[in-house]
A protein has these predicted regions:
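Conserved small/polar residues in nucleotide/adenosyl-binding loops
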Residues: 250-252
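Conserved G1/Walker A P-loop phosphate-binding module
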Residues: 1-109, 125, 136, 143
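Conserved C-terminal guanine-recognition region of P-loop GTPase G domains, centered on the G4
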Residues: 60, 84-245
């Protein structure tokens, strides 16, 4: 079963989205680090086509595919250097197969920090890239020395060198359009930014009409047309509060 990790700044709506997807009741509070240890649950992948087929075949039981959803504590600027939940937060991300960025696009006087999803995206991407850069540089020095005697690791070293160059610019690896060969070579190093990415722009309940514009802004930055990440990243918009009610009912 694949694991999807919900990642974002504090109070972006991660726990509310987790509850909606899994039918859980994890604490969702308007203060930082309400989630310290990750919440883990299972979500059904609802597919109308499956329901239609079941109806046609008169099946009594429909078995939906499932994914594991991990609600990871809020990331803050400086996490790669230990700020906030620091290394614990980053370690939790390393255990997932895909990352879901939850980006806040609503104003709430009780929640500190920016309400611009692009600012949320900037902080999250930079911290993940810096964490990967530190990991790559730590391993690369040792492996470059070893490669002088062991030519069998030359390709792996070259992949790490390419990754280092990209990360040093503060850009996640998924933006580079990682080749399948490099992805395989980098897999043993569990780099955060080699994972698949989905971005969810979370708008206010009374601002559904802003979704197309907000999604377009984030997509233009995260996966612009013609870029390496265009087909690597998907951007969705929603009001998590509304989805919590609608998706929650589907789990009843």
């Amino acid at each position: 079963m694949e694991r999807f990790g919900l990642v974002g700044l504090p109070n972006a709506g991660k726990s509310s989205l987790y509850n909606a997807l899994t039918g859980s009741n994890a604490l969702a509070a308007p203060y930082p680090f309400a989630t310290k240890d990750p919440n883990i649950g299972v979500a059904k992948v609802l597919d109308p086509r499956l329901d239609a087929l079941a109806k046609m075949s008169e099946s009594k039981k429909v078995v939906n595919a499932t994914i594991e959803v991990v609600d990871i504590g809020g990331l803050v600027e400086g996490a790669s250097k230990g700020e906030g939940l620091g290394n614990k937060f980053l370690a939790n991300i390393r255990e997932v197969d895909a990352i879901v960025f939850v980006l806040r696009a609503f104003v709430d006087d009780d929640i500190p920090g920016p309400s611009d999803p692009l600012e949320h995206l900037r902080v999250v991407e930079l911290e993940l890239a810096l964490a990967d850069l530190e990991s790559v540089e730590t391993k690369l020095g040792k492996m470059q020395k070893a490669a002088r005697m062991d030519k069998s690791i030359a390709d792996e070293v070259a992949a790490l060198e390419r990754a280092q160059k990209q990360l040093a610019d503060g850009r996640p690896l998924y933006r580079a359009g990682i080749s399948d060969a490099d992805r395989e070579l980098l897999a043993p190093h569990f780099l955060l930014t080699t994972r698949r990415v989905l971005a969810v722009v979370n708008v206010a309940e009374n601002a559904l009409d802003t979704i197309p514009a907000q999604v377009a802004r984030v997509a233009a930055e995260l996966a612009p047309p013609g870029s390496a990440s265009e087909h690597e990243v998907e951007v969705l918009g929603m009001s998590v509060q509304i989805e919590a009610e609608e998706i929650g009912r589907a789990h009843v």
